[in-house]
Amino acid sequence: MISIVNGTSTLSLVAGSVETLNQAINFYTNILGLSVHSEQNDWTYLSNDDNKMIVKIQLDTKSGLSLDQVNDRRTEIIAKLNVTDWRSLDTTSVLKVQNLVALIETLTTFNYTLQITPNELYPNEVYCVGPIGYIIGFTACDEPLTLVPPLQKSHPKPGLVSNLMSKSGSQSRNIEETKAVRRNIAVMTSGGDSQGMNAAVRAVVRATIFHGSKAFAVQEGYAGLVKGGPEYIKEMKWQDVRGFLSEGGTNIGTARCMEFKERWGRLKGCKNLIDAGIDGLIVCGGDGSLTGADLFRHEWPSLIQELKDKGEITNEQFERHKHLYICGMVGSIDNDMAMTDATIGGYSALERICRAIDYIDATANSHSRAFVVEVMGRHCGWLALMAGIATSADYIFIPEKPASSKDWQDQMCDIVGKHRAQGKRKTIVIVAEGAITSDLKPITSDEVKDVLVDRLGLDTRITVLGHVQRGGTAVAFDRTLATLQGVEAVKAILELTPDVPSPLIAIDENKICRRPLVEAVRITKSVASAIEAKDFEKAMSLRDHEFKEHLANFMAMNTANHEKPTLPREKRKKIAIINIGAPAGGMNSAVYAMATYCMSRGHTPYAIHNGFAGLSRHESVKSIEWIDIEGWNSIGGSEIGTNRQTPEETDIGMIAHYFEKYQFDGLIIVGGFEAFVSLEQLERSRAMYPSFRIPMVLIPATISNNVPGTEYSLGADTCLNSLMEYCDIVKQSASATRGTAFIIDVQGGNSGYIATFASLISGAQASYVPEEGISLQQLEMDINSLREAFAVEQGMTKSGKLIIKSSNASKVLTPHTLADIFNDECHGDFDTKTAIPGHVQQGGLPSPIDRSRGDRFAIRAVQFIEDHCDVLAPYRYELDFPIDDKKILNTAAVLGIKSSRLRFTSIRHLFDFETELGRRMPKTIYWNTIRDISDQLVGRTRLDKP
């Protein structure tokens, strides 16, 4: 039933021609369901069924608009679709309808352009240009002024490509959200491409739509901004970015643009953004691209004033676009931006380098050859440094730490020669493309090769990786980073005010944060300036702390027992390392780093093989020799063996006996929750067993990431990369067969970490985790969501769907049971299958992140033991042991990342106050916000837990 919102019963209209009159009659009868009541002279009367509403249309060629005038007016109004609220353009008539969603679908079928508020999924009002040139609106509201409009959720039909978006039940829409700031936001990729840019574009587009704003993409970087028009500044719909997550490069294009460096080019860009109605611009690129973006914002007031003075924009446009809001995301494989730990694409490029060197290792070892590997990095040696750490390279050349023209040859030959003398068959030297001597002379790969051949007589080859480093899909970390930063960038644009400087979205350890864009770019550029000025100490000081820490670690590990130890003999210790729990990527890296760092310091490293069971039953203790662990950094699993038994489950007294026999001064445990429990048992037994009165550190290593005291565990990244590749392949199969969804069962115990992040990086339609369980109501909503999604994407490519289920989310609803339920309840709209990756999730070769973090954590653990030995030494054999002394308690700790810091936390505090022992979980988890974002970006509604 249709009526007028303000309560009046009659609507009077004027048609300027017979054609427009007939169009109006067809509109009100065929679309709105009115019927022709009568015709008198030039008047036509239409009414609804109970005659409570009358529409009178008069044919008047003088006062009404002709067909051409109607078309011109329609074109003029539609041009302002993304710029102006149509309600402000003219007096509008608003009709009340019972089913607004159905009317929207009907109007769309008849090719009417609609302006919908607040958005297409939850429409309150919809406006279109009627057949005789009037703006007409429709609503489900009973009153013209209402504080709580009735929200009807859209259910898309086949062929109706809608801007699907949804919000989790925990963040359901309310009246406050409808008052939020809405801005038209454009995203642009610029400069060199990097893996993860597509994930960033997808996140920006969908987060923008989710917040009720309009999303745009600037094609071809700044070149597209200068050229402008709908071809280069294109409105993006929800479905336009499907499949972006698994694709490398940038699908919206990038180009270097000299025109934008000139003011006239930026003036054209300003005009084009205003024409498109853009309020905010998110730029993903390197320091040059971000510098241009900030300059653009700085000049914006003068640019828009110039356009107004020239008459190229109206006063209304000038007032509407007085301010441009800009936010930066760093897309660069060099990872050379200051004030952020990682850039989008950096770890993907590092993965390509490490994978290539892993392959090269095999042939180098076979022929006892040396390989010189050239990697990218003109002014930043991050790729070369991290690759050197992750692959145990013999030598690296980076621009931040040059040597004199002769010194580098002597240093390299000295280290490589000693490695060869120790029995190493292969040699890997990594050269950053920007490597230089202290007098700024470039060091080329050919020069390095010649030195290795002439001075050491090594059969040497050169491998230049080139653009292979940019290619391929993004790794799990870069997909996560790009997605979270894209969502944060949209929030930043919506929250910015004219007096707030442009932000740069950064990451600090494990936390997404905002930094001043101008300051970050300034520091980044000053590094290159310092190098050019030969001020290498300043250049190194401008790098972040983690870079300097990694460089110091590499130099220490690289010398190992080949140089004089750095500690005096009286301070050298015996330090043991043991693996507990299931194998995880990075365990071997931790053993390698611990052993080599101990050797460089003068300590004696020991490996306890096969866990505490191996120690108590077989006395499986062995000192570590350098040549025995050569290459372990790149090997998956656990070379020293591992099992799940804790000290109390084996024989804690026998373990104490062997600790005393070997006179261990420190212990490093690498493992998951069993390792956590083991450390607690050892710490609790100190009063009874003096041999446990030594510093002890746990390095969390488990794919479940369920160890209290840390937000990241070794092995989790390797697991996510393996699972990501698996999901991409399964999704490809689902897309190829059309109308297919796969339920993928993943590990993780009682932790939903793996399922949550796998859902985020694969674009899964839903994920089920133990923390929430699976309710029938949620299943029903997810099935309906899948039906809607398949309806919208009917006939489209890249339309395969995934559902991620953690094994312990439900013991009753197994993957096969879930698949049967989905197939039965979907009424044939799609087909559901299962896929179970099993132990494939543990991964093969550890990822570069797990390798480098394993090294970093192990060295920090050794340093912790060095720092705390003196605390326990006075009490080693005292009968009255102060077990509750805080200093004593702090000598048994978990090393972890929490928020944005690397920290040691007492095992006693964690065990007593932050652990759910029965569930083998920490009491608080940090990835709930990740779940919300993952659901938002696929349009899933998640119910609150009761």
Swiss-Prot record:
Any single biological process term in GO: vacuolar proton-transporting V-type ATPase complex assembly
Residues annotated to bind beta-D-fructose 2,6-bisphosphate 2: R644, T702, I703, S704, N705, N706, Q747, G748, G749, H839, V840, Q841, Q842, R920
Interdomain linker: annotated span: 560-573
Keyword vocabulary terms for this entry: Allosteric enzyme, ATP-binding, Cytoplasm, Glycolysis, Kinase, Magnesium, Metal-binding, Nucleotide-binding, Transferase
Residues bound to ATP: G192, R256, C257, G286, D287, G288, S289
Catalytic residues, chain numbering: D334
The UniProt record lists the keyword Cell cycle: no
Chain intervals for the UniProt region annotation (C-terminal regulatory PFK domain 2): 574-946
Stored InterPro entries: 6-Pfructokinase_euk (IPR009161), ATP_PFK (IPR022953), Glyas_Bleomycin-R_OHBP_Dase (IPR029068), Phosphofructokinase_CS (IPR015912), Phosphofructokinase_dom (IPR000023), PKF_sf (IPR035966)
Pathway involvement of the protein, from the record: Carbohydrate degradation; glycolysis; D-glyceraldehyde 3-phosphate and glycerone phosphate from D-glucose: step 3/4
Cell compartments where the protein resides: Cytoplasm
GO molecular function terms listed in the Swiss-Prot or TrEMBL record: 6-phosphofructokinase activity; AMP binding; ATP binding; fructose-6-phosphate binding; identical protein binding; metal ion binding; monosaccharide binding; mRNA binding
EC number: 2.7.1.11
PROSITE patterns noted in UniProt: PHOSPHOFRUCTOKINASE
Primary subcellular site in the record, as a coarse category: cytoplasm
Residues annotated to bind beta-D-fructose 6-phosphate 1: R369, R461
Reaction it catalyzes: beta-D-fructose 6-phosphate + ATP = beta-D-fructose 1,6-bisphosphate + ADP + H(+)
Enzyme kind, highest EC tier: transferase
NCBIfam families: 6PF1K_euk
Entries under PANTHER family matching the protein: ATP-DEPENDENT 6-PHOSPHOFRUCTOKINASE, PHOSPHOFRUCTOKINASE
HAMAP family: Phosphofructokinase_I_E
Subunit structure: Heterooctamer of 4 alpha and 4 beta chains.
Protein name as it appears in the record: ATP-dependent 6-phosphofructokinase subunit beta
Organism lineage string: Eukaryota, Fungi, Dikarya, Ascomycota, Saccharomycotina
Gene of this entry: PFK2
